[in-house]
Amino acid sequence: MSASGYKAGYISIVGRPNVGKSTLLNHLIKQKISITSRKAQTTRHRIHGILTDVQSQFIFVDTPGFQMRHRSQLNQVMNRVVLQSMQDVDVILFVLEAGRFGREDEQVLEQLPRNLPVILVINKIDLLPDKLQLLPFMQKMADLFDFADIVPVSALQNRQLSDLTEVIRHYLPENPPVFTEDEITDRSERFLAAELLREKVFRQIGEEVPYSVSVIIEQFAVEGNLRRIHACILVERENQKAIIIGKQGKKLKDMATQARKDMEVLFDGKVYLEIWVKVKSGWADDAIALKSMGYE
């Protein structure tokens, strides 16, 4: 690709938990690389998703949901990731849920830089009970911050995402591409395997357990078209271990099957997956343990 007139830049996606940031990223790049669930704090790491076309390269930075309710070391690390992600980028997407602007959204708004183009993305417009509420909500938000642009979308239904892409393109600087055309993320297959398994835990288990769960890939071997993966699901208490395993191991088996299928689609090959569940008390408040697990 010629660098002449070509645009490339980093776009940080920020917002409170559960506004649909990861779903937005996955649909923008047309590939699932960031895990999703209805539970807060599903995303824990900064993940780059890359969309490349003949005119531009969009390097999206998905981030954890910013929130101040929990004070664990893990939550502090995730909030720090969000704040760092708003530095050294070219554009920021501030994602809100249509018709909803609460204290947690306000806390994110207070962190937004004034020296960068910030695009307000109003997501989940399909869930707005009265569509006439949208324009007043957009005006309300425009009065609170000098947004470069405001774009209403439905990430889940792929509505107006092409419009959003064109708005972002306008604000990207002229640069040669950073990544090759076929790269869709900066994360390794090992990392993505851990995330896909953690997603299944979040989706299958009740409200409390997921926040005490982490996934560690202990072995990742590539043998031709086969990937052999040994994974450990880490929890904080014995009763959580029992919940994840389930009666006669059924829950764990179901999670393993679903994760393996997703991995085979993403990696375009066969996957042999073995999973263990281990207890490590207090890991979410252990700075050394968090660092060893790859938390920034």
UniProtKB/Swiss-Prot annotation:
One of its GO terms (molecular function) is small ribosomal subunit rRNA binding. GO terms for biological process: ribosomal small subunit assembly. It is found in: Cytoplasm; Cell inner membrane. PROSITE patterns: G_ERA, KH_TYPE_2. Pfam families: KH_2, MMR_HSR1. Signal peptide: none annotated. Its main location: cytoplasm. Residues 205-281 form the KH type-2 domain. GTP binds at residues 15-22, 62-66, 123-126. Residues 41-45 are annotated as: G2. It comes from the Bacteria. The keyword Transmembrane helix does not apply. Residues 7-174 form the Era-type G domain. Residues 15-22 are annotated as: G1. InterPro entries: G_ERA_dom, GTP-bd, GTPase_Era-like, KH_dom-like_a/b, KH_dom_type_2, KH_sf_prok-type, P-loop_NTPase, Small_GTP-bd. It is a peripheral membrane protein. Gene3D superfamilies: 3.30.300.20, P-loop containing nucleotide triphosphate hydrolases. Transmembrane segments: none annotated. Residues 123-126 are annotated as: G4. NCBIfam families: era, PRK00089.1, small_GTP. An essential GTPase that binds both GDP and GTP, with rapid nucleotide exchange. Plays a role in 16S rRNA processing and 30S ribosomal subunit biogenesis and possibly also in cell cycle regulation and energy metabolism. PANTHER family: GTPASE ERA (PTHR42698), GTPASE ERA, MITOCHONDRIAL (PTHR42698:SF1). Monomer. Belongs to the TRAFAC class TrmE-Era-EngA-EngB-Septin-like GTPase superfamily. Era GTPase family. This is GTPase Era.
